[in-house]
Amino acid sequence: MTLRNFFALFACLLVLGCDNEVSAPADTTESMAETATEPAAKPHYEPWGVDLGANNPDIQPGDDFWGYANGKWADENEIPPERTSHGVWLEIHERAEKRVRGIIEELGDADNETGSSEQKVGDYYASWMNVEKVDELGISPLQPDLDRIAAIENADDLAAEFGRQYFVYGSSPFSAGLGINPKNPDEYMINIGLTGLGLPDRDYYLDDTERFIEIRQEYLIHITQMLGFANYRDPVEYADSILALETAIAELQWIRADRRDRDKTYNPTTVTALKEQHSGFNWAAFLESHRLEFVENIITNHPDTIEPLIALVNEQPLDVWKAYLAYHLISGNGSILSTKIDDANFAFVGKVLRGQEEQLVRWKRGVARVGAQQGLGEALGQIYVDRYFPESSKTQMLELVENVRAAYKERIQGLSWMSEETREEALMKLAAFYPKIGYPNKWVDLSDITISEDDLFGNARRLREFFENRDVEKLKTGTDKEEWFMMPQTVNAYYLPNWNQIVFPAAILEAPFFDPNADPAVNYGAIGAVIGHEMGHGFDDQGSKYDARGVKRNWWTDADRANFSSRTDRLGEQFDTY
């Protein structure tokens, strides 16, 4: 969840609550008991939980409340050169980051049993920090993949390589991603769609304003550099061809608003129909190399792009596609290759695209890699919550969730513009929200993964293979609603419409967002806003398309949907004036 997304929270709360007042939430948060020998714990920010040193009393809150509350902090702090933003999120993130580093380095110094989670965590980090070994290998770990790409002889080979790219951090114009079936929350399905761009969005290719023109020029330099690391012949010429190819893909890509529309992107079909209707591409080779040869029922996300994308695949010279695959393979693996490649990759991806002045120091990047969801994040998460997340915080958070839910219920019950038919469904959905607090009830079994202290590339590749194969198995076994899609040490939260779940990892439940020893009003104003934000996603323009069970269906009357849209449109118009 980003700062920008708080506007969505305020919009949803205003629309759902503009007709009635909100009762103060019941104060059910119990303070910690005092004993004769142990005084009550104090809040992180004394005396009652808010950092009053951040405010600027020279600003009248009625004129500029943000400036009044945060003005002094804003004047005294700058965005760090290795970051693109700054604020309380970064403060909490760095607190968790230091804790995770301590855990990792402690495990690295210990005599751990081979194959244990502790050994894997310590050795994965050690392999990342062994820069001398990484530099010694240079680009050589990628050579088998580059040789395979160079050996592509025809369209069938190309289709197979497109499918294989998901296992090697490469790229493909066709995506085949795992997703929960919008009509059945108990099963997964494969989504076929358009992808394959090296720049963030179609506008980066098609917009001729000065900024985007400069980015495209820098992109050409970047592609040339990456191909040069592989001693590619004519890298400048191929860079031009790759940019032209991706521009053609960008012209087919839907605009962002359509890509996030759950109705437009839900187009169920079958592989049999896909092969019959779009026979110019070897779907069997593509799916088999992706280990999806057994799949029949699928969803196409952007159906009108499939045929023109196939035409593009077949019309472009094979050598251009091979150069495209080679470039994305090198760039996609840049962070686990030599310092020279890594730095060159950051110079474009970090500096040009993200506006990040400096690369994060290596230990921070290593902590992020080891602790990632598709790294050893759950192994780390178990230790993190044992050390830093007491069960009492989970209990207190559940009380907060229930009180925010109660306030939301009052809002919905008091809406004069909503029909009883829609209100009944809305209240059912609200009551069915399933909160997950802190950490999973069961953890991912990582015992089959081999991690070596001197093989960074191999470690990353084996982890990628493990999680891709795990996704394939999910298609056969169905969903597990106890699964988490964030790690406990992540400072964030999310709402999952398919399962109607709101999820709050342990690391976000820290002061100033959540403080078990602060005045209850502080927690309602801080983490309460995050709780309300995630609940709000269940009733926003896309989340409201799912019912209490997480099934995608329209439970709104036409009049209620029109009323909701008119109110959110007015808020959007107001926002546009700022």
Feature map (PLM): residue ranges:
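Sec-dependent signal peptide recognition
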Residues: 2-9
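C-terminal motif of bacterial Sec signal peptides marking the signal peptidase cleavage site
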Residues: 14-17
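Bacterial signal peptide processing site
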Residues: 19-21
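Post-signal peptide N-terminal segment of mature Sec-exported envelope proteins
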Residues: 24-41
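Short, Gly/Pro- and small/polar-rich lid/capping loops
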Residues: 36-53
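Active-site-surrounding "flap" and adjacent substrate/cofactor-binding loops of secreted or lumenal enzymes
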Residues: 41-44, 60-64, 68-133
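Noncatalytic, helix-rich "gating/capping" subdomain that lines the substrate-entry/channel surface
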Residues: 105-399, 403
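Intrinsically disordered, low-complexity linker/terminal regions across diverse proteins
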Residues: 277-280, 300-303, 365-369, 373-377, ...
